[in-house]
Amino acid sequence: MSFTCRIKKELPDFSLDLSFSTDQKRIGILGASGSGKSMTLKSIAGIETPDEGQITVDGQVLFDKEKKINEKPQRRNVGYLFQNYALFPHMSVEQNIAAGLKGTKEEKIRRVQEQLARFRLEGLTKRFPGELSGGQQQRVALARIMAYEPQLILLDEPFAALDAFLRDQLLQELMETLADYDGTVIFVSHNRDEVYRFSQELLIIDDGAQVCFGDTKELFLHPRKMETARLTGCKNIAPAKRLDEHHVSVPDWDLTLTLQQEVPSELRYVGIRAHMFEPLWGDMTPENVVAFHLSDVAEYPFEYKYYSHSPDICWYVQKSSHQEIEERGMPKYLRLPEEEILLLW
């Protein structure tokens, strides 16, 4: 199934300006809070109206400003899962699933029974939302959406208010329950781990502007743009200048990089993820190293996070790899392996 979204909308704090098209089934939207992610979903669902553009699902036009097409939300065949699931508190599970369904009584009963079985809710039919766990509430909300047989499902940060353990558990449940759904799912989050795990393709938004759109794993591995690197979790990014085809100056790190690959002319920044440094001891100073001056350390259950000043560097070390540091002390330098250096613009 194909999906296209090309929209513009003026908002009080920024202008929403997006243009992407895909035939993948699982799409992620990543961005900081207030960057325009929820407004994008509301525009797709028909809750908000863009100032210009077009939205289509599998050839069906949901919105086209020039042609004056703007289908009402209830006619778009789009399911929208809100952050709080928006269940009716005084309705039972089966009543929530049946709410708003059209058709004969027999048809409604059949569709409700199908979703109760699909989402493993058969023993909970008479319970109310307040008597359900977070995972059960999520399944009821999804069952209500799926009873409408939508072409497109929109998930608006469904785990934002949950702790890390429950968030991981519910994400796994969500992926399992949607495994046999043939439509497109758009998953919005400010959590990069969630969108990496869920999505095949990823849209990154920053202050309403489309930073990039493409294969999720490729964007994490080769972000290319500074904003993409930052939003996918790169902790070490510094302004850089191309000196020639194989050399880059990084003044903030007091470093000149020598590279085998050709340096792109559009280069503006250099980055390296915090886990990718190689520690070096002794007075030897090979190419592509930064001096390491420990200013702070934070211990976490499975890793240490070291912070250097002059230059400002973050270095993360897994506890399973920490023995050498315990034996030899802090390294004098950190090496930037060329294959881990991010050349950005």
Question: Residue spans of the language-model regions?
Answer:
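ABC nucleotide-binding domain signature
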Residues: 28, 70-72, 76-86, 186
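Catalytic "switch" loops of ABC-type ATPases
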Residues: 47, 78, 82-90, 191
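Non-catalytic connector elements of ABC transporters
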Residues: 5-32, 38-39, 46-49, 60-61, ...
